[in-house]
Every structure is written in structure tokens, then in C-alpha cells.
């Protein structure tokens, strides 16, 4: 039989096939080969009625996330709150860089709109990200329309209201929610395991919350491509490997000055580039200490 893993918990993999869910385990040869099944995997499996089954084969994945461990994703809703925690374009761009690098379509959703005081600032970000080509939504109804028939991951900083939002769009989930800690300004981790839920002919997944994101981009070229508006303009740079920092005849820096590329987006790009270069330098220093 063939099906999709919709939940992984305590060594068991729950596989959905033809409307039924089967409890399975992975064969020992998966561990020997270093292969781990993840939520979202399409698998071949065997299972007798009312008995535990076994995963026999994992099909090729189109994409994957490490944290949370989930695969074969169509799109990801990045939830950013107006307040508690405050909207942070740097953190949002870290999520977007990760998703662009993984080939996952991003949707930006703004939560806690009732706490909004300055609509002008939100309009600025909505216009900027919209011009780049991102869906930037503020209403539950608009978000629901984008979920039909898709496998969607929900992600965001701890405390932005992922579980609260999912409870609103799919009340049957009844997910646990947490409040913001006054001392830290962070929410309690309320999501315990990654699971798929059926909604609007597609599947949605709530994912464990976290307050920081280490994107998996290690090359300047990949970072360039993860900023779509920079990637487009950089085609006119003199050098194909232009990092838009010191090279002559760079097309990106004038585009920033002219407002074609938002200054805050370019600043975030430069910060991420510096972090990549610093990681490389640290790796070189550590490597030198390894004895021959």
C-alpha cells in the first residue's frame, strides 16, 4: 500500500491511505542506512487490518525542513504579530530566506491586528512585500482562501499565535495555546509534535514554536537568490558573483538608492551576508586546529 505520513510520535508513524490511518514502524534497515521517515513523506507500507504495520520504502522528497522535521511542503504561512512580540522585519526575512532556499512558497500572515496602533507602518510593509510578490494577508478569510488543496506549514516566532490561529480556522483541532511571559516577552512552547490535519481539501501542520531561526544558506550566491528583488536586479551587475558590497558596476546598490529595492531589505541582506562570511571564517579557524 501507499500513503502519506501525517504524524510521527514515540517511534510510531501514522500513515494515511484511502481515508484510513495506519500505525506503523520503520524497518530496521532504515536506521542502518541513516534514513528517517518524516511527516509528509509518501511511503510504501504493509499493514494487516487492526495490526501494526511497517514502512517499506520512502519516496523521493521534493523539499524538506529540518526544524521542524517535515517534508513535501507546498507553502508555508509565516505568522508575524503586530505586538507581543513586536513585528520584526529582520526575523521575517530570515524565514523568507529559508523558504526561498527550500523552494517553498511563503505566505505572510499578520496576527493580533486588534493591537495595531500605526496602520501606516503595516501598510508600508504590506506594500513592500506585495511588490516583491509575496502574499501578505491580515484576515482569516483571506488566508483560508489560500489553503485550498495545498500542504501548508504554519511557522513563526514563539508567542505570535500559531495555535490560536489554527483553532480559529479549524476549531476541531482544539490545540493548546500559551500566553506571553511578561518577564521575557516570549510565549510558552505549546506545540509538542508535528502533525498534519485535513482542511479545505489540503493539509495543514502546526509546528513547534521557536524564538530564533538559523537559516541553511551557506553561500553568498544562494543568499542573493533568496531575495527575489535583489536576484532580479543583480542580473545587470558586471560580475556574476557580485555580492553588492564592494564590486564595481554593481546594479543593486543604485537600485537601493532609487527605492527600487527597500533599504531595510538590503540592510537585512547585508547582515545575513556578514553572518555567512563570519561562519566561514570561524570554520577556517577551527579547521586549522585539527591535527594532520
Swiss-Prot record:
Its main location: cytoplasm. GO terms for molecular function: GTP binding; GTPase activity; metal ion binding; rRNA binding. One of its GO terms (biological process) is ribosomal small subunit biogenesis. Gene3D superfamilies: Nucleic acid-binding proteins, P-loop containing nucleotide triphosphate hydrolases, Probable gtpase engc, domain 3. It comes from the Bacteria. GTP binds at residues 111-114, 156-164. Its cofactor is Zn(2+). The keyword Cell membrane does not apply. SUPFAM superfamilies: Nucleic acid-binding proteins (SSF50249), P-loop containing nucleoside triphosphate hydrolases (SSF52540). Residues 62-213 form the CP-type G domain. Keywords: Cytoplasm, GTP-binding, Hydrolase, Metal-binding, Nucleotide-binding, Ribosome biogenesis, RNA-binding, rRNA-binding, Zinc. Zn(2+) binds at residues 237, 242, 244, 250. Binds 1 zinc ion per subunit. InterPro entries: G_CP_dom (IPR030378), NA-bd_OB-fold (IPR012340), P-loop_NTPase (IPR027417), Ribosome_biogen_GTPase_RsgA (IPR004881), RsgA_GTPase_dom (IPR010914), RsgA_N (IPR031944). It is found in: Cytoplasm. It holds the Pfam family RsgA_N. It is an enzyme of class 3 (hydrolase). The keyword Nucleotide-binding applies. Belongs to the TRAFAC class YlqF/YawG GTPase family. RsgA subfamily. One of several proteins that assist in the late maturation steps of the functional core of the 30S ribosomal subunit. Helps release RbfA from mature subunits. May play a role in the assembly of ribosomal proteins into the subunit. Circularly permuted GTPase that catalyzes slow GTP hydrolysis, GTPase activity is stimulated by the 30S ribosomal subunit. Monomer. Associates with 30S ribosomal subunit, binds 16S rRNA. This is Small ribosomal subunit biogenesis GTPase RsgA. The lineage of its organism: Bacteria, Bacillati, Bacillota, Bacilli, Lactobacillales.
Amino acid at each position: 500500500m501507499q500513503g502519506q505520513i501525517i504524524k510521527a510520535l514515540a517511534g510510531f508513524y501514522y500513515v494515511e491511505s484511502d481515508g484510513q490511518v495506519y500505525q506503523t514502524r520503520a524497518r530496521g534497515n532504515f536506521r542502518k542506512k541513516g534514513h528517517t521517515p518524516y511527516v509528509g513523506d509518501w511511503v510504501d507500507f504493509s499493514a494487516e487490518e487492526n495490526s501494526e504495520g511497517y514502512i517499506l520504502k520512502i519516496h523521493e522528497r521534493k523539499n524538506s525542513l529540518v526544524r521542524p522535521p517535515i517534508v513535501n511542503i507546498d507553502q508555508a504561512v509565516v505568522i508575524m504579530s503586530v505586538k507581543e512580540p513586536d513585528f520584526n522585519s529582520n526575523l521575517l526575512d530570515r524565514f523568507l530566506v529559508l523558504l526561498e532556499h527550500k523552494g517553498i512558497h511563503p505566505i505572510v500572515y499578520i496576527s493580533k491586528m486588534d493591537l495595531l496602533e500605526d496602520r501606516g507602518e503595516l501598510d508600508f510593509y504590506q506594500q513592500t512585500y506585495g511588490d516583491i510578490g509575496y502574499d501578505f494577508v491580515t484576515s482569516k478569510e483571506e488566508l483560508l482562501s489560500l489553503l485550498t488543496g495545498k500542504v501548508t506549514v504554519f511557522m513563526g516566532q514563539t508567542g505570535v499565535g500559531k495555535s490560536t490561529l489554527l483553532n480559529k480556522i479549524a476549531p476541531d483541532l482544539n490545540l493548546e495555546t500559551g500566553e506571553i511571559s511578561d518577564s521575557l516577552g516570549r510565549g510558552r512552547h505549546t506545540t509538542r509534535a508535528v502533525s498534519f490535519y485535513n482542511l479545505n481539501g489540503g493539509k495543514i501542520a502546526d509546528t513547534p514554536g521557536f524564538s530564533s531561526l538559523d537559516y541553511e544558506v551557506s553561500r553568498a550566491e544562494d543568499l542573493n537568490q533568496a531575495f527575489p528583488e535583489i536576484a532580479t536586479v543583480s542580473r545587470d551587475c558586471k560580475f556574476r558573483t557580485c555580492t553588492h558590497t564592494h564590486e564595481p558596476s554593481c546594479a543593486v546598490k543604485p537600485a537601493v538608492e532609487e527605492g527600487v529595492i527597500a533599504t531595510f531589505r538590503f540592510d537585512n541582506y547585508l547582515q545575513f551576508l556578514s553572518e555567512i562570511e563570519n561562519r566561514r571564517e570561524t570554520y577556517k579557524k577551527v579547521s586549522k586546529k585539527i591535527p594532520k
